[in-house]
């Protein structure tokens, strides 16, 4: 096979594959964003559910932070809190594969992340209403 044809086929195939991956990422982004908005934006959701979803919120922010159009101060607060959360979870002592009971900082950081999630969700709803 001619190397030019082979190379062009490879480029086309790569672009198609890349487009499919981006479309899947867009669907995943949209689905997870909606789920987290329901968790943190709905006042009828209990605090325990919000605490259980902190890890999902952290993973979502890590993966999609560049796609989130937040104000600079909100972005900075989120980055600071998530850095602190990761530091505290890295320090957590595991007993038989589960985190040990007690501790002061990790629950406090989780509380701040839950409050930030609620604030971000309300900001998102405000923007949606204004549009």
From Swiss-Prot:
Coiled-coil regions listed in the entry: none
A single GO cellular-component term on record: extracellular space
Endpoints of the signal sequence: 1-23
Tree of life domain: Eukaryota
GO biological process terms held by the UniProt record: cellular response to heat; innate immune response; response to bacterium; response to heat
Subcellular location: Secreted
Keywords: Immunity, Innate immunity, Secreted, Signal
InterPro entries recorded: Turandot
Entry's family note: Belongs to the Turandot family.
Protein function: A humoral factor that may play a role in stress tolerance. Requires Mekk1 expression in the fat body to regulate response to septic injury and consequent immune response.
The protein's name in its UniProt record: Protein Turandot M
